[in-house]
Amino acid sequence: MSHLLFAYYLCNDIRSFQNLLKQDDSKVKEPRKGFSEKSGQKLRINQKDRYGRTVLHIAVSENKNSFVRSLLQHKGIDVFVQDEESGYTALHRAIYVGNLEAASLLLSKDPSFRSLRIKDKEGLSPFQFLSRVLSSTIHPVLDLPIIGNELYGFGTNVNNTLGIANGKEPSSPERVFLLKNQTESPTSGQLFSRDKILDVQASKFHSVVLTDEPSQNVYVCGIGAGGRIGFNTDVQYNFIPIPGIIHKVIQISVSHTHSLALTKFGSIYSWGKNGSGELGLSNDELKKDDPIQITPRRISAFKDYQIIGMAAGKSYSVAWTDTDIYSWGLNNGQLGISDHISVVSTPRRVAGLLSPVIHAVCTTRATICLLQNNSIIAFCNYNQVKLPFNVDFGSSLKVTKHPLSLTRFNVRKLLASENKLAVLTELGEVYEFDMKLLLDRDSTSSKNSTRTSFKFTPLWIFESSDLAALDIAWTADNSLILCTRNGTCWKRELRSKKREKSSSSPYSRGPYKYNRIENLQMVVGVRASASGSFFAIRNDYLPPPIYKPSNMLIDLLRSLLPYDHLLHVRQPRLIPPEDEDGVPIFDEDRAASSNEMQLLFEGSIPILTSYENYKQSFSDVTIYCGTSMFHSHKFILCARSSFLRKLLLQKKKSSVSNIIYIEEITQSHSTIRVEDIPPLAVAILLHYLYTDTLLSPWHLDSRFSPLKENLSKLANLLELPHLAEVLPFSVSRQPLLSLTNDILQLYNNFYVLCEETMDTVIKLKDGELKAHGLFLSLRSEYFSSYFQFVSMESNSFDIPITVNLSHLTVEHMSIVLRHVYSDLKVELFDDLKESDFHNWLETMFEILSIADELLFLELKSIAQQSLLRFLNLKTLPTLMDLSLSYHAEELYSRCIDYACHNIEFFLEANRISEWDGFHLKKVAQRLTELLSDQRVHLPSSKIANRLLIRDPVLMEKRNYELKVLREYLFSQESSQLWDDSPYRSIFEDRRCSTSAVILESGIVPSSNQSDSLNKEDAEEKSPKPNVVNVTSITKTAGASVEIQNNIESASSGGDKTQLNGPGADQPVTATITFDKTSPWRNRENLSHNNNTTRASLRELLEQEKADASTTTVLSDSRFMKAPTKKSQREKKKELSKQVPISKTNVGHIDIELGKSNHSNPWSVATHQRGSFSSSTGVKKSFNGILREAAREEGSSQVIYQESKKRISNGSPTSWNLLTKPSPRSASLPKNSQPLSISEIMTEQKEEIESQKRRSSFRKTIEEIQQEEEFQKWWEEESLRVQKELGILKTERDTSTNRKQGQASKQPQRRHRKEKDSKVSESTAEFKSLPIDIPRTTHKKGKARAVK
């Protein structure tokens, strides 16, 4: 019944599919077997097709998740089954095509997440498989050094070295936060800003973190005894900055008792215990009775040196410049100084190095330096020893030194523990060196013995570039931790089981194994302490910022000028942000172009004439100058000029220097008159007040030169310092920008300075706020439309306009108004006084909702960008839900992109099951887009569309193929489809391989193929009885609809036989050698053999005539005929023509011994009465010496041919063997004995009895007539369909077979010639016509299902 699952799936019949599973599910007793008994049939839900795929594999790959859910609800489903081609599980396939919903369902079925550890045939788990596919899309190769933005800690936390607040030891990696310098009321920007981590150093008692901040960028935690943490504290649980270092630190190094810090100016600061002079400070700088430096102190010995690196040992320290290296502290022979001085209190230069030092590590008894020339020098035993990089190539088969790896052993990093030295190469390989060989070596040993004894052993040799090591770290017990280029983290551990120690893994050797650390991805650096504390620096993916070319406040105010249409629209220039959290800035050239100057000042001077008959709706100030009149806004004049603010707010008439006169002051309008100043100067002044830009017409025409002096007079009078500074220059210069700052400063103090200028009152839930309708309308389309509606209802603005927004609060609306009066971006929300992230998040989305409601589009983008800064693995689900609810499309899109880049994390513990279905669908769509470029070989809609445009017939062919396959799967014959799979697990199945034949005498064959590809089928398959059969070719899903032929070994000359005569002492093994089974190759073999063995063909036709008498043929016969008997001489003659068979060769064709092989899906069981097949021919079994074995089978199989259509009646006789075998045919041994007379007589007697038994199964006349009628209809319908599809170009005469039947009554010679011509014609046309498989047979003119 397994074929019905595939049939319902191909028909997309989900109801029938589910019903079949439910009927079977109630009877399943053993869930792991995956089948049930019903009417003698088995539903094997984990059954594979010919291509080694289960229904679950196919449904997952084709994104048919309704079928996946139904399959996973079945008790017998096995989600760990791997396909036979690549070893992919269903989870592999789901991840490969981006089907996250199916992946979530599969992980839900696997609570232990065992499927995440199953590897395919390339040794890749699902995550490694995904990482390799997306290596260039999601995980690009990063350049070093890398700045991480997240720090994770795990392992032991005995001395509070992990920086976790509660002091617990986390079982899995846990996020570590740095507490920055904060005031009593920190802002949200200070609390929730993202860290930028450069380095982490850990010792047994304390840990130090280095960030990228400009100052105070060193954070410490741990045990403070001895001054090791830089301030007077016994225990510090969290990472806090160290005070006392005013410059930015670029490198840190720690030991058990002291710490070192290197600033960007080359100075070294040290603090901690100075018991052996390891701090590098002179004796007079420390107290003799208490040699402890609590706070960081600069080493004065290096004040004239530019230090580029340093390292701290247990009781000493080293530092180096670009030319020399210096050491100080306790001298045990590791300082590189030949003098036997016990303590070196101040830095001392080490001599003898031929190349500058670029890296160094310290242990208790040795100092190892990496030189610029890639040499490794060790200071130990008061000597300098060079360690040649001699790799032990015999320790692993993976380590080979090929000619193309000239830079393979370039050292990138050194790492040392007490007894081990690890070397990380530029290629990403890790090697180990045993330090005991170096430390126990006598200083008088010869150099030659040193070179031969030192060997580096490989620890990590990768098989793909994405597994190259990026960073490594040691612990005291030699536990190695490393991270790779694909962002995964691995830890080397001692094997716990003996069987594991003897096993071999791609990434482990000897007693150690590498385990992947869960819940860690995108790791760029690892650190470890001697006590077993581990740190992982993670560089999380940062989505692209949300920015738009927004309108600056200057642009909005410039639009109020009447001649704004004459100014060209400048294309903004994108300035990249200063840091990764910043937003790109759109800048533009503020100076007016020469063309604009000509448009404004030439002819009738449009800058003046444009003010005629122009009045802005919110203008409340009128300026008269001569005959010209200018309209302006009181709030802008007050914000730009403190002098005008005093005049306009004093509410009385006044004059200044006989130039400016205040004539009228009311709440709604004011009038200003300017004397002795040309109107053009006033126009230029207003342009500056509104745009911060100075127009210089005097550079265009000299007649405008007096304007410069008048403009300078107004600038000094109105207290405009920035404008007055640039006017004296002869060259055109623009004043400093001050418009935005002036307006924001006035808004922050508007209740004191300019409350009277407010013309809008906003009624809120807990109070009211005043604002300017001008700015509200410039920022929001909502307020612009509202004020326009109010102006249509009332012709004057004498009273303040009231806006009712009672559902909003004053706190939230104040933030909105702050945006209205400024150009602040994400800084707008950094001043929120929220100490809790969830409260801050709620406030942010409330503002986002207000911006969306009131159409503050720019504020909406800024709020989304501010929220995007705090997107991480923990906040992603919340941000996705809220952004979708508040219509934050840009933020939601970035969340989806972030989820795709961290999909491994969310899949690892099936965290995607917590997502909403809509989110899961969107993430899957985005992931599919990212995967589309990486898996171009898979079918996609784009590729399919291009193929259909080029060849439209492909769709018809595909539909035809699926139709034929469905028809076939619903037939009873299809139950044998799966036995012919090329991926069958057991040896007796029809898989092309080299095998030996099991004979009746009990000889067991030997096989060189022991792999089991389908364990379930191997367990359920019963042993085969002793019968010889030939491999048949079947048609399966995915193959093209062409003629599928089952070629007997007679057609290719092959045979397998056995001689068991009375005088035979040993059985003879028949051997056949064939190529791999292929339907196309078998066609070639058939054509070849028919053309090269003419005599055999005639004998074949002669035997066919004899067989026709015992076979019911619908086209020309309605009764049974007795078989033609052969004499003993004829049989001996045929036997003598056979070529001897080799006893030792092993055949290359699969043979089943026992009952008839019904694995051919196109064959029909012949023992059933009335069984009908749509084939065009009858498959023949062996005769001659193989007839004995074939007779025991008692049945035959049907093969398709195009010449005739027949019905199998179970006759054991079939085509004769070819008398002239092909070069591939089997042969009998030359000394084989002929059959005896008694055997021949027994054979003939059995043939007669067999024919009598078969003659009893005669069909009635009614059944024969029905089959003839249906056959005629089927031939006509098949020819018509073939002609429509263009497969058959010429119409065939359907009555040919009938005429051939009548021609059989002609003389024997004529009959033989016609048969020869017809067989050759049928062979030539054998490859052109497809096979049409009928769904039904006729009964009284109607169709019925095939049984």
UniProtKB/Swiss-Prot annotation:
Name of the molecule in the record: BTB/POZ domain-containing protein 1
Species assigned in the record: Schizosaccharomyces pombe (strain 972 / ATCC 24843)
Record's compositionally biased regions (Basic residues): 1336-1347
Gene name of the record: btb1
Functional description taken from the UniProt entry: Probable substrate-specific adapter of an E3 ubiquitin-protein ligase complex which mediates the ubiquitination and subsequent proteasomal degradation of target proteins.
Compositionally biased tracts (Polar residues): 1208-1237, 1297-1306
Keywords carried by this UniProt record: ANK repeat, Repeat, Ubl conjugation pathway
Subunit text: Interacts with cul3.
ANK repeats: 51-81, 86-115
RCC1 repeats: 148-198, 215-264, 265-322, 324-372
Any one GO CC term of the record: ubiquitin ligase complex
Alphabetized GO MF terms: ubiquitin-like ligase-substrate adaptor activity
Claim: Repeat is one of the keywords in the record: yes
Keyword match Repeat: yes
Any one GO BP annotation for this protein: protein ubiquitination
Entry-linked Gene3D superfamilies: Ankyrin repeat-containing domain (1.25.40.20), Potassium Channel Kv1.1, Chain A (3.30.710.10), Regulator of chromosome condensation 1/beta-lactamase-inhibitor protein II (2.130.10.30)
Biased composition (Basic and acidic residues): 1013-1023
Pathways involved: Protein modification; protein ubiquitination
Domain BTB, residue spans: 619-698, 758-829
Region ranges (Disordered): 1006-1029, 1104-1139, 1193-1237, 1286-1347
